[in-house]
Amino acid sequence: MRLALDAMGGDFAPKAIIEGAILASDSLPADAEIILIGKEQLIREHLSTLEGNKSRIQIVHADEVIGMAEHPTKAFSQKPNSSIAVGFHLLKQKEVDAFCSAGNTGAMLVGSMFSIKPIEGILRPGIAGFMPQESGRFAVVIDVGANADCKPEMLAQFAVIGSLYTKYVFGIENPKVGLMNLGEEEEKGTILTLAAHQLIKELDSINFIGNIEGRDLFNNKADVIVCDGYTGNIILKMGETFYDLVSKRGYDDTFFNMFNYEEVGGSPILGVNGNVIIGHGISSPKAIKNMMHQAYQLTQAKISEKIKNAYS
């Protein structure tokens, strides 16, 4: 299994990325290889100063970098030799099984939409986030930022996509799907959620439990939480602050530690023809390591194929 990693993406690249790659190489199953994409000489210089298992790390040269502040569409089209563009080329040509980056999120979305492209039948791909639950596991939240404005049909697709991910990656046989709303009653909500509710409840392939409220985010009520990207991104960013708050106050709590972005590593873009994971711009080596482990799980579970089958 060949897992590609953008060595130039992130606020602390390439050092933190390369350190994370070595941590992943030390801990991933034996069939995994890591392909670092970026400026080869710079990558080799960093590798030479670090200890760890480097035998499963290869390098693909890319002499351009898409900066965090660059316009995603313009940068992706004008920098075909950037580490992100090269990563998507390798993924499209099936030379790698997954592509991960902590770089420009917009460019990663552009690559997903216009390079490997959405799966036929999928209106728009969604980004999946992960919300800690009192039980000690995570619930999938989709969408958390790919689509600020959504159509009801998109939320219905997110319900299916999120359910497939939860079943095959988390191993939950009949995941409970909830629609994030301002009340449990079916007649409550916005024009979007009212229409989406009617579409989702007609889906025989998922276990829809109806609307859920903000107070249900952490109480194990739903395994999949469906929402538009605007709402989901607010939920995700709010959750990230919990770990910062308790850490500053000197608390060490197992539940709140799950809100540490490093523990998850990244967020998959679901509904496209390939395995793509985006990481936090401030990703540490630990976060990169966990993002690579997530890429391994995503690839092993064959989520893209499962989604294709659902819409074939």
From Swiss-Prot:
Its main location: cytoplasm. It comes from the Bacteria. It catalyses: a fatty acyl-[ACP] + phosphate = an acyl phosphate + holo-[ACP]. InterPro entries: FA_synthesis (IPR003664), Phospholipid_synth_PlsX-like (IPR012281). Pathway: Lipid metabolism; phospholipid metabolism. Pfam families: FA_synthesis. Its EC number is 2.3.1.274. Keywords: Cytoplasm, Lipid biosynthesis, Lipid metabolism, Phospholipid biosynthesis, Phospholipid metabolism, Transferase. GO terms for biological process: fatty acid biosynthetic process; phospholipid biosynthetic process. GO terms for cellular component: cytoplasm. It is found in: Cytoplasm. It is an enzyme of class 2 (transferase). One of its GO terms (molecular function) is phosphate:acyl-[acyl carrier protein] acyltransferase activity. SUPFAM superfamilies: Isocitrate/Isopropylmalate dehydrogenase-like (SSF53659). Gene3D superfamilies: Isopropylmalate Dehydrogenase. Homodimer. Probably interacts with PlsY. Belongs to the PlsX family. Catalyzes the reversible formation of acyl-phosphate (acyl-PO(4)) from acyl-[acyl-carrier-protein] (acyl-ACP). This enzyme utilizes acyl-ACP as fatty acyl donor, but not acyl-CoA. This is Phosphate acyltransferase.
